[in-house]
Amino acid sequence: MTSASITNTGNETMNLPQMRSIWLDEDEEAEKLYGLQAQQFMGSDDEENLGITFINSDKPVLSNKKNIELPPLSPNSHPSCHHRRSNSNSAKSKESSSSSSSANKTNHKKVFLKLNLLKKKLLGAQPDIRGKGISTPFDFQHISHADTRNGFQDEQLQEPSSLSTEIKDDYTSSSSKRDSKSLNKAFVTERIPANRESKLISRSHENKTSRLSVARSISVTSSNYSKNTQGNNHSINGRVVSTSTMATSIFEYSPNASPKQFKNKSHALGHRYTNSTDSSESSLDFLKNYNFPTLLEDKPILDFLPRSQRSSAYRSLLETPNSNKDSAKAFFPSRQSPLPKRRNSIATPSPQSKFSYSDSPVNHRKSFDDVLYSFNQLEPLQT
């Protein structure tokens, strides 16, 4: 924003100071300016009235449009006026001193020259204040943004050089000492030194745990590194070795290994239940010895017996109950609750089934409680 005005005060013309720029630092001030533009284009609302009067050259607001009287400016507000007044005063003094003798003139000139030389030596060359100074009309306070470029430019210039040196040091040097600048970033962890890593590799070869590739699992390396640091430094603040990190090791992959080698390793481990290496035989033996969880359907239990034993079982069931007590006990023992009775078990009722499988017809649908009760009855026969 630039503005200039000239006023006639008597016979002399005085240039008012110019307001060259306004920097808004606060967001609220910027919102006021945007809201002021919205009021001009859309109309003002009583609720959101900002209370700002905008003075425009097209629509003057002041009543007195000509010969505006202004208070006299202080000499500090505008250095150019003070400079002109001092020049005029010096000119008047020169005119008055012309009547004096020539010896006094030469003496005064010599004194002024000596004073100027001393000022230049002590203060140096003074820059032009008019070009760089900010005008302050009517005690206006200049608002400017905080200059953050000076603080961040040095860091931006130093970052690429420091990064390049750090990368070279990681691959060339084996020392663990680093500059403090490299650790001024978030999520930075120190790399395992090369000499300690070589010791870990030699120890792993001695314990017959050779690695297949350089890319080891993170859990094993972290646990081994913590062991090494605790053993060498004996520090209280050392890392605590946890069993969870040591137990998460997996098969390591190497680019030179073929898929046949992995198959041979899996076959050499053997089956989980049998020690045989043949996968087909182990699966058959596992299926033969495995007890599948069965759920009884509408068919009676005797249908699960072999065909040669079904006829004898049916005949024994069709006989009279008095003559077939022993056979009935063999297949269906006495109805008792599977839960053991206690002395103080009056308040806990025991589950009782209404009928057994021998009394029920063939096509009768059983409930789940009856199926559980039948399994509890047949448990002694299986053992």
Curated annotation (Swiss-Prot):
InterPro entries: CRIB_dom (IPR000095). One of its GO terms (molecular function) is small GTPase binding. Keywords: Cell shape, Cytoplasm, Cytoskeleton, Phosphoprotein. GO terms for cellular component: cell cortex; cellular bud neck; cellular bud tip; cytoskeleton; incipient cellular bud site; mating projection tip; plasma membrane. CDD domains: CRIB (cd00132). The keyword Zinc does not apply. Present with 1130 molecules/cell in log phase SD medium. Required for cell size and shape control, bud site selection, bud emergence, actin cytoskeletal organization, mitotic spindle orientation/positioning, and mating projection formation in response to mating pheromone. Interacts with GTP-bound CDC42. Belongs to the BORG/CEP family. This is GTPase-interacting component 2. It comes from Saccharomyces cerevisiae (strain ATCC 204508 / S288c) (Baker's yeast). The lineage of its organism: Eukaryota, Fungi, Dikarya, Ascomycota, Saccharomycotina. The gene is GIC2.
